UniProtKB/Swiss-Prot annotation:
Catalysed reactions, as listed in the record: allantoate + H2O = (S)-ureidoglycolate + urea
Keywords of this entry: Hydrolase, Purine metabolism
The encoding gene: allC
GO biological process annotation, one example: aggregation involved in sorocarp development
Organism of derivation: Dictyostelium discoideum
Biological pathway: Nitrogen metabolism; (S)-allantoin degradation; (S)-ureidoglycolate from allantoate (aminidohydrolase route): step 1/1
Listed name of the protein: Allantoicase
Length: 369
């Protein structure tokens, strides 16, 4: 059985749980500029953390709000430009007006472009390359609204417009990471589980206390809530999660980090792997035969554990790994450092691989409405 996290919106479309969040500050998103931020700074819009409310807090400009809020009486509309933390194909947006009740904007729209030259705000605001990917849409009072994006292209920046003014707590963009693999040095080890490279947690036995995707986020965890933690297991068995690697790779080194988990870390862990060629139905990976690559190994609290000489059966490429923890507990980060299989045509095929990732990913017919 797979248990739901209490912090996840049960009404959210499936791209929220099945895709990477490309925009937040946690993955490197940056607000480059905006038309106005009188009441609350635009950087709040891409905070990884959920918005909070403080009824008693006021600042020099007025009521403190955990979001982006502009002045009243704009004769036109406000907008901001944000650089995605991870370039990719966007499948949907989440616009959250939490705690903005009488001051939310009635409508919003979004445009996007792709520019890897790292342009500045002034260049971007004058650009003619913006493409509408979300038409002007209705927002609501203190609620989350979800909007599907049907433009199957790689983007690096978005322009978020609100009409005419007001406050939005958070903006999320969910999609598929598209990485340029030609930039990888031959022989270099790459963390193929990392979200910034295109790794994704696909299945989990339980993530009651922490979002499952925390485990593949950049950097070390900042606190216990910034990891993956399961409930106390009262019956037999153990907890686990599966990660779809960014691409097939030969596992060379593994890191399991229990940072901040001191009285609630797993006593041990093991890791299995599988290649999708032997498991055609990725939605039922648990039903297929997995290869053990890390035998059951003891863990300690609040520590980084590195495994290299302990690895077994790791002489061939895999596409998915499964982290088993015994019996339950918390892990903050998982790193699966791999070498890429040798291929004479590897560089020539990279563009084709990226195109395939774009066209075959998360089809509209597979999305929840």
């Amino acid at each position: 059985m797979v248990y739901a996290n209490n912090n996840i919106d049960p009404n959210a479309p499936c791209y929220v749980s099945e895709c990477a969040e490309l925009l937040s500050d946690k993955v490197g998103g940056v607000v480059l500029g905006c038309t106005d931020q009188w009441f609350a700074e635009c950087v709040n819009l891409i905070k990884h953390s959920a918005p909070v409310w403080d009824a008693e807090k006021y600042v020099d400009t007025g009521k403190w709000m955990d979001g982006w809020e502009t002045k009243r009486h704009n004769p036109d509309h406000d907008w901001c430009i944000i650089k995605l933390g991870i370039p990719g194909v966007i499948y949907g947006f989440e616009i959250d007006t939490a705690y903005f009740t009488g001051n939310y904007p009635p409508h919003a729209s979004i445009e996007a472009l792709c520019d890897d030259s790292d342009p500045n705000f002034n260049t971007l605001k004058e650009s003619n390359n913006w493409e509408v990917i979300l038409n002007k849409s209705d927002l609501g009072s203190s609620c989350k609204k979800y909007f599907e994006c049907k433009v199957e292209k790689r983007f690096t920046h978005i322009k978020f417009r609100i009409y005419p003014d007001g406050g939005v707590a958070r903006l999320r963009a969910y999609g598929r990471v598209v990485k340029d693999w030609t930039l990888v040095i031959p022989g270099e080890l790459v963390d193929l589980a990392a979200i910034e490279n295109g790794g994704l947690v696909t299945q989990v036995s339980d993530h009651f206390y922490g979002n499952k995707n925390n485990i593949i986020m950049p950097g070390r965890s900042v606190n216990m809530g910034d990891g993956w933690e399961t409930k106390r297991r009262r019956g037999p068995g153990n907890d686990w999660l599966t990660v779809k690697l960014a691409k097939e790779g030969i596992v060379k080194r593994i890191e399991v980090d229990t940072n901040w988990f001191k009285g609630n870390f797993p006593t041990s862990c093991s890791i299995d792997a599988i290649h999708s060629s032997s498991a055609p139905d990725e939605t039922h990976l648990q039903d297929y035969e997995w290869t053990n690559i890390l035998p059951n190994s003891p863990l300690c609290g609040h520590r980084r554990h590195f495994f290299q000489n302990e690895l077994v059966n790791n002489d061939k490429p895999f596409t998915h790994i499964r982290l088993n923890i015994f019996p339950d507990g918390g892990v903050s980060r998982l790193r699966i450092n791999c070498s890429l299989p040798d291929s004479k045509n590897n560089n020539n095929n990279n563009n084709n691989n990226n195109n395939n990732n774009t066209s075959n990913s998360f089809k509209t017919s597979d999305r929840q409405q």
